Amino acid sequence: MVTIVLGAQFGDEGKGKITDLLSQSAALCCRAAGGHNAGHTIVHDNITYDFHILPSGLIAPDCVNLIGTGTVVHLPSFFKELDALKAKGLKDAHKRIFISDRAQVCFDLHSVVDGLEEASLAGKKVGTTGKGIGPCYSDKASRRGVRIGEVLEEGVVEDNLRKLEAGYRARFGELNYDLEEEIGRFNEYRTKLQPYVVDQMTFLEKYRSSPSILVEGANALMLDIDHGTYPYVTSSCTGVGGAIQGLTLNPTSIRSIIGVVKAYSTRVGSGPFPTEQNNAIGEKMQTIGREFGVTTGRRRRCGWLDMVMCRYSNSINHYTSINLTKLDILDDFDEIKVAVAYKLDGKRLESFPALPGVLDKVEVEYVTFPGWKSTTMGIIRWEDLPANAQRYIQFIEREMGGVPIKWIGTGPARTHMIEREV
């Protein structure tokens, strides 16, 4: 049976921690979409691990890991991450990671193009990670891309990469890019990559009857190419549909869909953010929460929890339970606000707006809660939480239509987690 972990907001919710926890009993952990633009941080045995393209399940010693067909894979990052895990003591990680031969290759060329495209937008920048994800998915959709399996075939990467480079040079002029260097590197990868490449359908067949397959979502629903705050989104399907498509999952095998919700809101890069706090409150959240991007190091914008957004996210992903994260970051706030509705021209909106211009203009209706003003760091039992923290959590559950909050994060370590019987 399959468990899917998905971000319910703008990303950076803390998906890696619940994935790490659940992967301890999982036979297989998979990434379905996205690339090395993702960033998941896990603290285990006082060691901090940063994941980008690799699934977080590699920390679990008995968990096999798969990078699925829906992903885009930057191979230098793939090998660099594997080496970093080995240096931190995960000596056998390279034996437990595989890549679908149908996944797309993300080249350094794509990163160069990403920067040029972003620069051309001037004052309307999307705020991408600059990792080349958008151009790579564009080449995939235009049927110009290279698949992982083709890296193993002599001459295929060189032929296709020369065509891609010529096309981008015709569009942008001279590029700050060494074509011959990248071709040479991929000639080396032809042998180096061989042990990791699998036919996904055949590979997954061995796990069809497994009681525990875990899917680790990347990014989040509000960055989904179809359902997010377009065009300020990533270039893949980040919701449950993307997981099913990218991993060829049987929908009837899905046992649970876990939505990961941060106890407040953050966003990296450009785009609408109705509950953003450009003030001392936002700065306090940013400082206490250490809100800097794992992938880019950029400062995250911060604001209050937005239940309008979370309800919209739930209506698309159909969460069976919620993991509420970083509750402890709110410990020192005198009062805590939660967005419950949007108004436009004095009227409550009945649905989540599709247009970013509308989101920029909405008036946010808040419910205000008294803070608990005591530490929740490291608490592992529900009954030990302050009463005001419990009320805050129960309100979120009601606003989510009764979807239970089963896990509550109270700190960075794996052990800093409350698991409720719900």
Curated annotation (Swiss-Prot):
IMP binds at residues 12-15, 37-40, 129, 143, 219, 234, 298. It is found in: Cytoplasm. Mg(2+) binds at residues 12, 39. Pfam families: Adenylsucc_synt. Keywords: Cytoplasm, GTP-binding, Ligase, Magnesium, Metal-binding, Nucleotide-binding, Purine biosynthesis. It comes from the Eukaryota. Substrate binds at residues 294-300. Binds 1 Mg(2+) ion per subunit. Pathway: Purine metabolism; AMP biosynthesis via de novo pathway; AMP from IMP: step 1/2. Transmembrane segments: none annotated. GTP binds at residues 11-17, 39-41, 300, 326-328, 409-411. GO terms for cellular component: cytoplasm. InterPro entries: Adenylosuccin_syn_GTP-bd (IPR018220), Adenylosuccin_syn_Lys_AS (IPR033128), Adenylosuccinate_synth_dom1 (IPR042109), Adenylosuccinate_synth_dom2 (IPR042110), Adenylosuccinate_synth_dom3 (IPR042111), Adenylosuccinate_synthetase (IPR001114), P-loop_NTPase (IPR027417). GO terms for molecular function: adenylosuccinate synthase activity; GTP binding; magnesium ion binding. Its cofactor is Mg(2+). Its EC number is 6.3.4.4. The active site is at residues 12, 40. It catalyses: IMP + L-aspartate + GTP = N(6)-(1,2-dicarboxyethyl)-AMP + GDP + phosphate + 2 H(+). One of its GO terms (biological process) is IMP metabolic process. Belongs to the adenylosuccinate synthetase family. Homodimer. Plays an important role in the de novo pathway and in the salvage pathway of purine nucleotide biosynthesis. Catalyzes the first committed step in the biosynthesis of AMP from IMP. NCBIfam families: PRK01117.1 (NF002223), purA (TIGR00184). This is Adenylosuccinate synthetase.
